Amino acid sequence: MRSLAWGPDKRATHYHCYNVNGFRFRTKQRDDGKKTQNSGVMVRGEYQNMSYYGLITDIIELRYTKGNSVVLFKCDWYDVAREGIGYKLDRHGITSINRTRKLYTQEPFVLECQAIQVYYVNCIKDLAWSVVIETKPRNLYDMPANKEEPYQEEEVQRFNTHVAEANEEDDERD
């Protein structure tokens, strides 16, 4: 608490790229000219489960005393306040945003731990709209919760049992 009360160091560190929660985020400037998009960001809001979408323009680390630090993403946000104008949901639950509708705010920052990476795919019918695709974190895999017995081990056990029975039959014939 004391570190926060004293405020951050007067110097801040700016990054073009930052890895957190299995995502590799880049600023929009760094993304330009690349084949991949890593500057798209989504933040899940608490009010009415509304999500906010934007592009990272700056990554800033504020350092405090005793080695504490906070990383903030400065973003250009899209205005998704009204359905049909700022965003659309199709019948499959896929979100599209109107990229011409910018949100002008005095609070463009989000904590790095709140950010979820997304990328935007241009809509074929209307170039002002883009479909939002949520990126899966790297090195995290969807593994089944139930532990199933390996099928291969059962086959091996049956095979060994069968071989033993065959050997016993051979002994009885002799």
Residue ranges and their predicted role:
Residues 1-174:
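Conserved, well-ordered core segments of regulatory domains
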